[in-house]
Amino acid sequence: MTEQSQPGKPASSEPATPSEPATPTEPREMTEARQAMVEKQLLPRGIADPRVIQAMKTTPRHLFLPAEAWPIAYGDHPLAIAAGQTISQPFIVAMMSELLSPLPEDAKVLEIGTGCGYQTAVLVALGYQVHSIERIAELSRGAQKTLGELDSLPAELLVGDGMLGNPPGAPYDAIISTACARKVLPAWIDQVREGGLIITPVKRFGGRQYLMRYTKQGRRLSKDDLGLVRFVPLLRGVE
């Protein structure tokens, strides 16, 4: 659930094979728009993992949006969804997914902020055991419906406070947050395994947000700063 952002990465030379329709009834223009998204937005910015490219080519972003938004569903920008939230810019979804590339395909991943379910669907397409938590029940219900129709339901879809993580499913190989925290939450550190990853935007002094990848080393976290981003804030509680 992000606003537009442009962290820099070297361009990929990976050619994009033609996209296939995500569903038997998918309009051709949606298939073509998704192919163009990969070729014009992802590859030039350095998205190179073949698994991520394939997941982005086969996950129908437009189905996570109302029909009136379909003509702009594959644009290089976030879009508004229900409850005052947004569906992330495609590049950000691809980038955050690619940051998980060191993990094995069956890794257990906790997603903080299901939103409409688009990032969730990409993670499922990558083969991860996805546990996803959303604080807004309306969004969780909508995501469950769409993901179910696409046969992309995660291992667990929960309504709850993402700041608390999901202790019953721990330990996780990675935790990925689609909302901006002021710091890495202690619950997340507790629930990720030794050597596991935490990928989250973090707000620093001055209000700027940075996408960070942390690796757990005991009670310490090593960190990689991946550049400026803009995400919706991580909030406490359940609605």
Question: Which residue stretches match the model-derived regions?
Answer:
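Conserved nucleotide-cofactor-binding alpha/beta core module
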Residues: 99-222
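Class I SAM-dependent transferase core
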Residues: 2-9, 21-110, 121-122, 126, ...
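Polar/charged low-complexity regions in secreted precursors and cytosolic/nuclear IDRs
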Residues: 14-15, 20
